[in-house]
Amino acid sequence: MSSDSMRNIRNFSIIAHVDHGKSTLADRIIQLCGGLQAREMEAQVLDSNPIERERGITIKAQSVSLPYLAKDGQTYHLNFIDTPGHVDFSYEVSRSLAACEGALLVVDAAQGVEAQSVANCYTAVEQGLEVVPVINKIDLPTADIERAKAEIEAVIGIDASDAVPVSAKTGLNVQDVLEAIVHRIPPPTPRDTEKLQALIIDSWFDNYLGVVSLVRVMQGEIKAGDKLQVMSTGRNHQVDNVGVFTPKRKVLPALRAGEVGWVTASIKDVHGAPVGDTLTLAGDPAPKPLPGFQEMQPRVFAGLFPVDAEDYPDLREALDKLRLNDAALRFEPESSEAMGFGFRCGFLGMLHMEIVQERLEREYNLDLISTAPTVVYEVLKTDGSIINMDNPAKLPPVNQVEEIREPIIRANVLTPEEYIGNIIKLCEEKRGSQIGINYLGSQVQISYELPMAEVVLDFFDKLKSVSRGYASLDYHFVRFDAGPFVRVDVLINGDKVDALSLIVHRSHADRRGRELCEKMKDLIPRQMFDVAIQAAVGSQIIARTTVKAMRKNVLAKCYGGDVSRKKKLLEKQKEGKKRMKQVGRVEIPQEAFLAVLQMDNK
């Protein structure tokens, strides 16, 4: 394809932290280019999932192609690819950016630069994108445009002297953003090979069309009837239709080099078209795929069990359907003595886990119990083999374990200066080791290496509370480190409850065991017999509490009378309690399983 036909195409995405006004700016751009009529406009046009709307976050990538008549009289084709902003979805962001030549960096004029936008901006710069700074929310009384510019230059290190000040809410200066896109972001450059290469930016499942893939054609063209090959799996599929989003779905005869659009090829599930993969023609394939593709690895695991055992087949079906849209979700059947049948699910992070659980409950009307999330540990066995363990209940016997290694992450925290002491204290409590501190204007960048297990539970919430919401976090996995880890088991009346097992650092084992026993004591309802709650490491009991039995007053009917009569009744009651204790099962309520999650939140 010639460079002339590409000259008026601009592919760009928006990098922004959660709540900095990315989706609102996208709405304004769509409106200005006439993508939707005024009556069809609704807030957050591109966030199509109700959870995305409610939480004000973007989970899946979306795209929209818009014609724009610029001031120089030429019509440009703008392809805007929306990206998720949360740290859990950083791989999806890198794929969206790989499909662009430029990016708008949106910064809130009142809040300044946040860690997540820094991480994504570095990704954009590494991939050679032209980054255009945009300072949003200038209509706020607390907006400080000069400070925001200074922060962009100090923290990210790009020139912000010609940053565009806008208010996406009122629509002020949005036209200037479009002009900046046209004049500052370069058009796509033709590749040297003519063979088809298309990057899959995202895939989702449609009940009528099968998998719809959002693609950026790097070279060549795709048209209906072509036979495509997915390069990582080697499978072939016939194209049904191609087109673009305007943001409604519009069918086109072909997608050419430099364009971004959708492809349907009756693929049955998103694993057949993984994000970041390359599409090529089956009859005339490209010599090599586009760089950067990687399998998504779940980092956090939790058990999901239906409250009602009859819902198990429905849960399986719901997870199968969700997986069609969510390539990062992994699950396998699991049975637990305490909870019955369910699934062990793998997620990218805590936000991903919450969203999946919320979608299962809301869209499929399921009542679910989730166990405490755990990370994947590496276990070196005495025979020299290494296993990955995502469930504490599956830890091999102590005499077979040489060492346990936990995942370590590198966390970058950006915070205003006054909260630095609180944040360092929090990181030290979480067994972190400091890597460095950089002072960048009024912001401070603190780098720590932390055990992922400490971050998974409540680190993000605690970070927000010690910094009054101002600190922001970005993290990535670095390595596995060996340490003195033990498994704490909970025994109720001598029976081990596998769903409550935890893996903890030996120095924390006693404290966590005591806290867990105390918490369980509050949550397990009183029975007709004493319930012993114990925490154990191996065969050693490290903590114990007892839920006292309820007693019926068996002497109430004895008015006076011989003491032996009373003794007989009390003995009979005691005998009954003893028998009950032998056969009695203790029902453990749902809250007790969540106790593990809330232990640190006291």
UniProtKB/Swiss-Prot annotation:
Q: Does the keyword NAD apply?
A: no
Q: Where in the cell is it found?
A: Cell inner membrane
Q: Describe the function of this protein.
A: Required for accurate and efficient protein synthesis under certain stress conditions. May act as a fidelity factor of the translation reaction, by catalyzing a one-codon backward translocation of tRNAs on improperly translocated ribosomes. Back-translocation proceeds from a post-translocation (POST) complex to a pre-translocation (PRE) complex, thus giving elongation factor G a second chance to translocate the tRNAs correctly. Binds to ribosomes in a GTP-dependent manner.
* Originating species: Stenotrophomonas maltophilia (strain K279a)
MF terms (GO), sorted A to Z: GTP binding; GTPase activity; guanosine tetraphosphate binding; ribosome binding; translation elongation factor activity
Q: Which PROSITE patterns match?
A: G_TR_1, G_TR_2
| Membrane topology type | Peripheral membrane protein
Which amino acids does the record list as binding GTP? Answer: 19-24, 136-139
Q: What Pfam families does this protein map onto?
A: EFG_C, GTP_EFTU, GTP_EFTU_D2, LepA_C
Q: What class of enzyme is it?
A: hydrolase
Q: Which GO terms describe its cellular component?
A: plasma membrane
Which Cys-Cys disulfides exist here? none
Family that this chain belongs to: Belongs to the TRAFAC class translation factor GTPase superfamily. Classic translation factor GTPase family. LepA subfamily.
Catalyzed reaction equations: GTP + H2O = GDP + phosphate + H(+)
Q: What is its EC number?
A: 3.6.5.n1
What name is this protein filed under?
Elongation factor 4
Q: Where is the tr-type G domain?
A: 7-189
Please give the InterPro entries that the UniProt record associates with this protein: EF-4 (IPR006297), EFG_III/V (IPR035647), EFG_V-like (IPR000640), EFTu-like_2 (IPR004161), G_TR_CS (IPR031157), LepA_C_sf (IPR038363), LepA_CTD (IPR013842), LepA_IV (IPR035654)
Keywords for the protein's UniProt record, in alphabetical order: Cell inner membrane, Cell membrane, GTP-binding, Hydrolase, Membrane, Nucleotide-binding, Protein biosynthesis
Q: Which GO terms describe its biological process?
A: positive regulation of translation
Superkingdom is: Bacteria
